């Protein structure tokens, strides 16, 4: 379970224009898929950083309140410990790559933790099957398309078997076909009982998958919709808060 308890955060001078958050209270139950939506700068990305520990361990700023993930207080444990529980896929997958070839990139996290070679091989084989990556193995990462890079990033996170997956605007650099692949990955994780947090401005592909849509504005939670409540909104109500209709044509 994820619990954000009265958290306020403002960035330091280097990131002073980034969207902070104000008195956020949020609980996410195990196995839920939750979408954080709202305009750019509303605080969506900041919430993902609170969950994966990049705040307060990487981004400087002033923080009040606490965040717990699976009973552990994020501010009091090393970032590498949080990373064992929370896997992150960033808006630009290239920013999280450590290797040039795809196979080494996927296994990097396991190798970094010193896991046995046989265990890594077994996990790799399973991940290749789960993500249908046979044609992408042994490739130069920088010769891949945006969608292929994201598949590798997701595979590199999934092989670590975290309980929680956090994604920051994962569809922003994808075409329609790659967005369908992204939905399939999210559906696979959900079928495994993973807790999923997605910061997103395109919402059409998440219908029928997300359990909640949380609208963030001005660093605060304005609305917390269940899937049924979100479906009951009119097109005008959806468009007012999120870019729901931006890619509506791709539904057909």
PLM regions: where:
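H-loop/switch region of ABC-family ATPase nucleotide-binding domains
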Residues: 200-201
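Conserved ABC ATPase "signature" region
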Residues: 118-136
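Conserved ABC ATPase signature
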Residues: 140-144, 148
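Hydrophobic anchor residue at the start of the ABC signature
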Residues: 154-155
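Catalytic Walker B motif of ABC-type/P-loop ATPase nucleotide-binding domains
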Residues: 165-168
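ABC ATPase NBD Q-loop/coupling interface
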Residues: 66-81
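Conserved small/polar residues in nucleotide/adenosyl-binding loops
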Residues: 245-252
């Amino acid at each position: 379970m994820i619990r954000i308890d009265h958290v306020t955060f403002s960035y330091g001078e280097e990131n002073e224009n980034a969207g902070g958050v104000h008195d956020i209270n949020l609980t996410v139950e195990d196995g839920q898929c939750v979408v954080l939506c709202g305009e750019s700068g509303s605080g969506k990305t900041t919430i993902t950083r609170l969950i994966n520990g990049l705040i307060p361990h990487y981004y400087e700023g002033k923080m009040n309140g606490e965040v717990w993930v699976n009973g552990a207080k994020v501010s009091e444990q090393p970032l590498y410990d949080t990373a064992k529980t929370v896997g992150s896929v960033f808006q630009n997958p290239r920013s999280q790559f450590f290797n040039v070839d795809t196979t080494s990139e996927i296994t990097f996290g396991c190798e970094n933790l010193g896991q046995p070679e046989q265990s890594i091989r077994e996990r790799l084989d399973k991940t290749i099957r789960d993500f249908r990556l046979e044609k992408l193995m042994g490739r130069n990462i920088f010769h891949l398309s945006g969608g292929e890079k994201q598949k590798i990033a997701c595979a590199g996170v999934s092989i670590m078997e975290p309980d929680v997956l956090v994604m920051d605007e994962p569809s922003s650099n994808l075409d329609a076909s790659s967005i369908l692949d992204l939905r399939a990955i999210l559906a696979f994780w959900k079928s495994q009982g993973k807790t999923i947090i997605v910061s997103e401005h395109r919402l059409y592909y998440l219908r029928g998958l997300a359990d909640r849509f949380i609208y963030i504005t001005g660093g605060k939670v304005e609305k917390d919709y269940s899937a049924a409540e979100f479906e009951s909104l009119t097109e005008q109500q959806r468009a007012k808060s999120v870019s729901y209709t931006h890619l509506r044509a791709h539904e057909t």
